[in-house]
Amino acid sequence: MSSKKRKSYFSNSQLPKRKKLFLQSGMKGFFCTSNGKEKDCIREALNLLDEQYSKICPKTEENEFRKEDIERELEKEVEELKNRCFSDNKPFQVIETDVKSCVFIKTTVNDHVKLATSIFTEIKDQKKCKSKFLIRLLPIEITCKAYIDDIKKAADEIFDVHFKCEPTTYAVMYNHRCNNSVLRAEVIEALCVLVRDRNLNHSVELKNPKKAILVEIIKG
């Protein structure tokens, strides 16, 4: 018999399959679009978000280094992968949209809009593209069903923060995919009414608004 120490191996079959999470009302996160290669898009988006999140909210505990033998490291890696599959507390989770080239990443980060903005600012300042398959990444403050009443209710929940303020300019940017039942003009008019309810002196500015209301509709 060989006196050499046996190596430990593990395969993907040892890991639980990732639970599929589906898009629901009341979520917040990031809406991502890809060039068709969704897995690569997800990888880039998660890496980008994790990297920026660690800069804004560094975890000193994760910087501690401990020497462990190979078997211990492998056991730890398997356990971490299992926890990643089932943990609901992790900051970023991929959500199924059932729409090709569209990905939603749910987040528990408190100010995820600030996180996204910091990514945009860094890319602009460094003049360096950080993704190949991730085409767009938009912070989403709230999700709802694709019905006009649900859209109005969701907007009403978040508009006080953005429009109970001094007069400003704004624009509604509307996009839809796999849905023809929601009328663009109806959505824009309804949201403009809600904005004016906060301050009658807010005005629409399509070319260079100070605030933008992003509406992304996918499916029905």
Give the label of every model feature segment.
Residues 1-220:
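SAM-dependent transferase fold signal centered on methyltransferase-like domains
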